[in-house]
UniProtKB/Swiss-Prot annotation:
Family matches, as CDD domains: MPP_ApaH (cd07422)
Catalytic activity from the UniProt record: P(1),P(4)-bis(5'-adenosyl) tetraphosphate + H2O = 2 ADP + 2 H(+)
Highest taxon above the source species: Bacteria
Protein name: Bis(5'-nucleosyl)-tetraphosphatase, symmetrical
EC number, UniProt record: 3.6.1.41
Length: 272
């Protein structure tokens, strides 16, 4: 049995299938972990959702910002952006089933054997493992509860941008969701920045990647994430694995086989 971890799909279903073929992925024996953002911008978000859902317990996927935004559009909270190319999901007979499946996905997942932590964007520089998992479970409970639409309507925004243990309600949940699905850079005082999406080398002075801030937890166990395609070629610390390599933007899709750390890649097909 092998454990495969795939970066952001963004609707790139054909590339996803070719990547699995390279590794001879067999869902009967192997397990698949995905960094989220299954949907948006690529040509076949619907197929990505259906395929991963059909794998059942053989697949573990964490929610990304585009996945959460899709939930908002399905609820009529936000308008659909044509560039997201998700119309087929709205027209699908199983859209409600897909929505309910998607909102029941975790924000953070820890492998029971290998102990790596999977998250879409990152882990707060102010959290340890216990706080990370506790905050994830809190927000997951809201997303999976009866008031999830109310939460989706209030989740947008950049405040608060710094953790406090006494945060409560929507402020606590928004901070946690932003960390798990949107974070890239932080300031030295560990405040989150949501404006800069540049490669690290081009970032304004005073900003650092979240994983380069001083947090002993980052060195205690592996953390695998996606979300940040402009990290391609950047040397992360040994315990940090960045797997979003911008397939939807014309680069390639990346998959890591955990047991031997072998990397599989698949170039983007047929760009518009």
């Amino acid at each position: 049995m092998a454990t495969y971890i795939v970066g952001d799909l963004h609707g790139c279903f054909d590339e996803f299938q070719l990547l699995l073929e390279q590794a001879n992925f067999d869902p009967q024996y192997d397990e698949l972990w995905l960094t989220g953002d299954l949907v948006a911008r690529g040509e076949n978000s619907l197929a990505c959702l259906r395929y991963v859902k059909a794998l059942g317990e053989r697949a573990t996927v964490v929610l990304g910002n585009h996945d959460v935004h899709l939930l908002s559009t399905l609820q009529g909270i936000k308008a659909v952006k044509p560039k997201d190319k998700v119309d087929a999901i709205f027209e699908a007979e199983d859209r409600l089933e897909l929505q309910n499946w998607l909102r029941s996905r975790p924000l953070v997942a820890q492998h029971p054997v290998h102990q790596f932590l999977l998250v879409h964007a990152g882990v707060s520089p102010e959290w340890d493992l216990a706080t990370t998992l506790a905050c994830a479970r809190e927000v997951e409970a809201v997303l999976q509860g009866e008031q999830f639409a109310d939460f989706l309507a209030q989740m947008y925004g950049n405040s608060p941008d710094q953790w406090r243990a006494d945060l409560q309600g929507i402020e606590r949940w928004r901070y946690a969701l932003n960390v798990f699905t949107r974070m890239r850079f932080c300031y030295a005082d560990k405040r989150l920045d949501f404006d800069c999406k540049l490669p690290v080398e081009e970032a304004p002075e005073g900003l650092k990647p979240w994983f380069e801030l001083d947090n002993p937890f980052y060195r205690q166990q592996p953390i695998i994430f996606g979300h940040w395609a402009s990290l391609i070629g950047y040397q992360t610390p040994d315990t940090i694995y960045a797997l979003d390599t911008g397939c939807v933007w014309g680069n390639h899709l990346t998959m890591l086989r955990w047991e031997d750390k072998h990397i599989f890649t698949q170039k983007r097909l047929n760009l518009d």
